């Protein structure tokens, strides 16, 4: 976690395309909306599809969900030049002055994507079992340095021949004691554990 700042806790959610970032956003919104004043910001390159999906799912009222069209590399919009997302955060804070929490979903990217500390106080990184049991040992800052690693789609392990015990051992080795959680977000499994981490690690 980066040095605390004045204002709502900003949680960055990153990970490759299809890993389950939007499903995690939806689950966290539904788990936390009754306890905290929150909003969600999503990033897509050319559309606002993830924002639309959250709205349709009823994750939050429509006015509390903002879609950002990055128009280019999704990594740049959360790291090297986060200005478009910082502007979105500022706008949400203007609309809702009492915010406790802002969830920020990056566009799908590779294992090297990380959030700028200017943008996110706490980072969650989502990978999925369908990518194969080798994913944790490939490393990259999302896997090794995120505040919480979320290993999603555990229900698919038997179908893709992935050994969860191997994935867990590799995760422990690559993360050096940093926390991780196995989830099956489609089933709702593990959402509460992630929500609890956000509350405790974020000091909510």
Swiss-Prot record:
GO terms for biological process: urea catabolic process. InterPro entries: CobW/HypB/UreG_nucleotide-bd, P-loop_NTPase, UreG. PANTHER family: UREASE ACCESSORY PROTEIN G. Homodimer. UreD, UreF and UreG form a complex that acts as a GTP-hydrolysis-dependent molecular chaperone, activating the urease apoprotein by helping to assemble the nickel containing metallocenter of UreC. The UreE protein probably delivers the nickel. CDD domains: UreG (cd05540). GTP binds at residues 15-22. GO terms for molecular function: GTP binding; GTPase activity; nickel cation binding. NCBIfam families: ureG. The lineage of its organism: Bacteria, Pseudomonadati, Pseudomonadota, Alphaproteobacteria, Hyphomicrobiales. Facilitates the functional incorporation of the urease nickel metallocenter. This process requires GTP hydrolysis, probably effectuated by UreG. Keywords: Chaperone, Cytoplasm, GTP-binding, Nickel insertion, Nucleotide-binding. Gene3D superfamilies: P-loop containing nucleotide triphosphate hydrolases. It is found in: Cytoplasm. SUPFAM superfamilies: P-loop containing nucleoside triphosphate hydrolases. This is Urease accessory protein UreG. GO terms for cellular component: cytoplasm.
């Amino acid at each position: 976690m980066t040095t605390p700042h004045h204002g709502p806790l900003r949680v960055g959610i990153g990970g490759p395309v299809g890993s389950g970032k939007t499903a995690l956003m939806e689950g966290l919104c539904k788990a936390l909306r009754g306890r905290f004043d929150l909003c969600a910001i999503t990033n897509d390159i050319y559309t606002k599809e993830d924002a639309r999906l959250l709205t349709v799912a009823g994750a939050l009222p429509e006015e509390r969900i903002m879609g950002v069209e990055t128009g280019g590399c999704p990594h740049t919009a959360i790291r090297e030049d986060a200005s478009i997302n910082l502007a979105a955060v500022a706008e949400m804070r203007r609309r809702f002055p009492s915010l406790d929490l802002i969830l920020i979903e990056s566009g799908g990217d590779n294992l090297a994507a990380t959030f700028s500390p200017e943008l996110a106080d706490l980072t969650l990184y989502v990978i999925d079992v369908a990518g194969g049991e080798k994913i944790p040992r490939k490393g990259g800052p999302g896997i090794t340095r995120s505040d919480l690693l979320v290993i999603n789609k555990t229900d698919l392990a038997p179908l893709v021949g992935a050994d969860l015990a191997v994935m867990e051992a590799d995760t422990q080795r690559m993360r050096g004691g940093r926390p991780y959680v196995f989830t099956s977000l489609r089933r709702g499994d593990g959402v509460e554990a992630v929500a609890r981490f956000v509350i405790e690690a974020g000091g909510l």
